[in-house]
Amino acid sequence: MAESSGNPPAERIGYITRVQSFSACHRLHSLRLSDEENKEVYGKCNNPYGHGHNYKVEVTVRGKIDPVTGMVMNLTDLKKCIEEVIMIPLDHKNLDKDVPYFADVVSTTENLAVYIWDNMAKALPASLPYEIRIHETDKNIVVYRGE
């Protein structure tokens, strides 16, 4: 193990991930496609009555580890941000009817990740957002990094 010289190390970058679960329903349906095309593209997820998910979202921030606090950011602040950006607008909601963003955007998990990213980016210092990872099911996971 390397010995410490007592000098602070060069800037270190850390990653913090907070996990949050929420439930919501939606229907995969594009206004740019005919009813027949929607059924073909989205299958059972185009059911007119919609369907629901218990989403698990991982929000990861990246930044310099503050030499004084030892933190990239205060987890309490990240928790509040997630509450405002994810839980209040999305939990137990119909994404297509209750979230204005999805009025003309198909509520795929990819677009949900973009929505969460864009709103987290507005709520956090610019350098911090790193990744949004959404587990739609145990087998289906979407990752978005603002690219």
Curated annotation (Swiss-Prot):
One of its GO terms (biological process) is tetrahydrobiopterin biosynthetic process. InterPro entries: 6-PTP_synth/QueD (IPR007115), 6-PTP_synth/QueD_sf (IPR038418), PTPS_Cys_AS (IPR022470), PTPS_His_AS (IPR022469). The keyword Metal-binding applies. It catalyses: 7,8-dihydroneopterin 3'-triphosphate = 6-pyruvoyl-5,6,7,8-tetrahydropterin + triphosphate + H(+). It holds the Pfam family PTPS. One of its GO terms (cellular component) is mitochondrion. The active site is at C45, H92, E136. Pathway: Cofactor biosynthesis; tetrahydrobiopterin biosynthesis; tetrahydrobiopterin from 7,8-dihydroneopterin triphosphate: step 1/3. Binds 1 zinc ion per subunit. It is an enzyme of class 4 (lyase). Zn(2+) binds at H26, H51, H53. Its cofactor is Zn(2+). Keywords: Lyase, Metal-binding, Tetrahydrobiopterin biosynthesis, Zinc. GO terms for molecular function: 6-pyruvoyltetrahydropterin synthase activity; metal ion binding. SUPFAM superfamilies: Tetrahydrobiopterin biosynthesis enzymes-like (SSF55620). Its EC number is 4.2.3.12. Involved in the biosynthesis of tetrahydrobiopterin, an essential cofactor of aromatic amino acid hydroxylases. Catalyzes the transformation of 7,8-dihydroneopterin triphosphate into 6-pyruvoyl tetrahydropterin. Belongs to the PTPS family. The active site is at the interface between 2 subunits. The proton acceptor Cys is on one subunit, and the charge relay system is on the other subunit. Homohexamer formed of two homotrimers in a head to head fashion. This is 6-pyruvoyl tetrahydrobiopterin synthase. It comes from Poecilia reticulata (Guppy).
